[in-house]
Amino acid sequence: MAMAMGMAMRKEAAVAVMMVMVVTLAAGADAGAGAACEPAQLAVCASAILGGTKPSGECCGNLRAQQGCLCQYVKDPNYGHYVSSPHARDTLNLCGIPVPHC
C-alpha cells in the first residue's frame, strides 16, 4: 500500500513538474520564429513523456505540429532533459516522428 502511494505521489510530482515546464516554455517561446512554437500543446503528451504510456492521437498530432520546435525545446537548459529523455524518444518513435539531431 505504501509503495502504491509513493508511486502515485511521484507521478503527481512529475505531472506538476511537466506543467511548470509547459507554462515556462510557453512564456519564453519565440513568437517571431515563423511557425508558432507553443509548448503548452505538448501537455497532452505528459503521461507518455514522463511515464512511458502510449501517446494519444492528439499527442502525436501536436508533436507533428511542433516538430520544427523540438530542437528549441531540447536546447533549453531548464527543460531539455524532458524532451531528450528516453520516454520522449519512444513517444516520437511511436508517433512516427524522427528524433531530432540538434
From Swiss-Prot:
Keyword Disulfide bond found: yes
Gene Ontology MF annotations: lipid binding
Annotated tissue distribution: Aleurone.
Signal peptide bounds: 1-35
Keyword Aminoacyl-tRNA synthetase assigned: no
An example Gene Ontology biological process: lipid transport
Disulfide cysteine pairs (residue numbers): C37-C71, C45-C59, C60-C95, C69-C102
CDD domains: nsLTP2 (cd01959)
InterPro entries assigned: Bifun_inhib/LTP/seed_sf, Bifunc_inhib/LTP/seed_store, nsLTP2
Keywords associated with the record: Disulfide bond, Lipid-binding, Signal, Transport
PANTHER family, per database record: BIFUNCTIONAL INHIBITOR/LIPID-TRANSFER PROTEIN/SEED STORAGE 2S ALBUMIN SUPERFAMILY PROTEIN, NON-SPECIFIC LIPID-TRANSFER PROTEIN 2P
Function: Potential phospholipid transfer protein.
Family in the record: Belongs to the plant LTP family. B11E subfamily.
Descriptive protein name: Probable non-specific lipid-transfer protein
